[in-house]
Amino acid sequence: MSKDYQKTEEQFRSAMAECRALFAKKLHDYGPSWRILRPSSLTDQLFIKAKRIRSLEIKKESLVGEGIRPEFIALINYGIVGLIQLEMGFADTPDISADEALAIYDKKADEALQLMIRKNHDYDEAWRSMRVSSYTDFILTKIQRVKEIEDIHGATLVSEGIDANYMDIINYAVFGLIKLS
């Protein structure tokens, strides 16, 4: 593994650790309340976060005092929640413990890492030459694709499914987080 690839993996792991720490704290405060979210609501939550990033990038000003970094963290965590919900389905009430939620979170985070490693090899660190605003636009595009796939009830002809789009959202958001560090 080249030094650049190794650095990317280390930065990715560090960013994911930051996201996991916040996820664990929110699990403590709220429990796995997100288990109630239906797919369309989760997609809209991702949209709100990405749209706010784009708005802040364009306006260069936040009136609520939070910047772009927390929104990338939210995209990563909600992306992982999305993967969990795809696997488990939504529930009427939270039906897993915080420990179970963290174990599943870790599994999905590792799947995202492994995908990033494979893609980073094939794309040869291209993400490092990209603008953060491009990650934002790509994330918004992925969210729009998820909406379309949801609207046709997953009956795609040639496209990847919702899970692949969530993975890409997570990875682009991690790249954004790294670039803003």
PLM regions and their residue ranges:
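Intrinsically disordered, low-complexity regulatory regions
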Residues: 1-181
